[in-house]
Structures are given as C-alpha cells and as structure tokens.
Amino acid sequence: MFKKVRCESTGDRRNFLMLVGVAGAAVGVLPLAGTASAIEMHNRVTATALSRVAAKRQPRAATTMQTAAALRDLWVGHIFWVRNVSLMTFDRNDAAIKVAEQQVVANAQSIAAAIEPFYGAAANEAFFKLLAGHYGAVKAYLMATANGDASAQATATQSLTSNAEEIAIFLSKANPYLPKDAVYGLLLAHGGHHIQQIQQLKDRKYDAEAKTWEDMKNHVYQIADATADALAKQFVTKFS
C-alpha cells in the first residue's frame, strides 16, 4: 500500500531545496513572534490534540496496523535525517550535510507518495511542497541558531507555525477524520521538538537531547497512528 521513493537524481534534490529556499524567503514577510520553547509548545497543545485524535479508538485491524507501521518508519526517517543535518551543521561538515539533505528529500518524497493511492498525484505533489516548507522552516531555525540570530529564530518559528497550519488545513480537507485543530496541535508539538533538539545540540546538552529524541520519536508515532486510523475510517473497503 505504501512505497518508499528513492531520490536518484540531483534534480529531485535541487527542486526540493529550491522549495525550501522559497519557504525560507517567506519567513521574512511573516509577523515576528516570540520563540516559545519546545516544552511550552508541547505542553500547550499535546494533551488536547491527543485527546481528540485518540479518544474512543477502536482496536486496529491488521491492515491498519501495517499502515501505521509503515508511516511510523517514514516519520522516524524524517526526524533521523533532519537531526543529522543539524549535527553536521554544528560540526561544519558540508559533505555530510549534503548527504543528509539528500535523504531528507527522499524521505519527504516517500511521505508524500504515501497518500497518492488515496488522494491522487496532485495531492502527492501538494503535500511534498508542504513538507518542503516544513523542512525549510526547520532549516531556517537551525541556521539562525548556528549564527546566534534571535530575530531570525523568531521568524523561523513563525514560519514553522504557519506551515503547521497549512498542513493541518490540507489534511483536514482531504480526510474528515483528521480534524484541523487536532492535526495542528500535533504538528506544533512536532515543530517544538525540532526547536528544542536544535537548541540542545547547539549547547552540547547531549543527555537532554537524548530525552528529546525519545519524546520526538514517540510523538511522530502518534502522528503516524492517527493518520493510519483516519485513513482506515475514510477508506473502509481498502482496509477490510
């Protein structure tokens, strides 16, 4: 039902990074916002989001569990390779950054391709652009942190927040079992984890970052599971 897409050409990577660049440029026209810590962001939104998405969940069928497992793998790939970009940025290892970003591209393609069997090629393309915007905002925050630019951190945080809302709108329109507010809350918390991780890596607080990684991983599992459950409810015959 799901397939992984390998980024075999430099053209795919260039197109993705061009979209990332557009997202980064868009940061400059967004209103400034204070940079909330990931913990504050997570505490504010996660309880409500999870209660809406997971409330009264029925036992999953085998096909739903398989879908959830595939989506978990994709989302863990996302956080793994974005973390590598962050690590190598602080290490100033350009060759390693290039490889990690190639994997970010391939992973984003796979996540976007996962919805094509349900919503079509146009949805795949639209979702890929939104994922590029997400990474663009994370990368902007990373570079701002590396450069010690608090103002750029704030604008990148606003971009990450705006992109989370765009993705929530997109998914909620596609699937009525993915309510906008719940998805928005989940994505805000996810963005908060990226922010916290970047700050901890910059400060070399590796013990704390190890805890953040575990929280981050468990949280993307929740995103994957909520998506699988929603697909199973919307496309009953595909999951029966």
Task: Show which residues each predicted segment covers.
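Alpha-helical and His/Cys-centered functional microenvironments
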Residues: T46, V82, V138
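C-terminal amphipathic alpha-helix
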Residues: L50, A54, R60-I97, E101-V104, ...
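A glycine-rich, hydrophobic loop/mini-helix early in the fold
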Residues: A106-I115, L131
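N-terminal secretory signal peptides
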Residues: M1-N15, V22-P31, S37
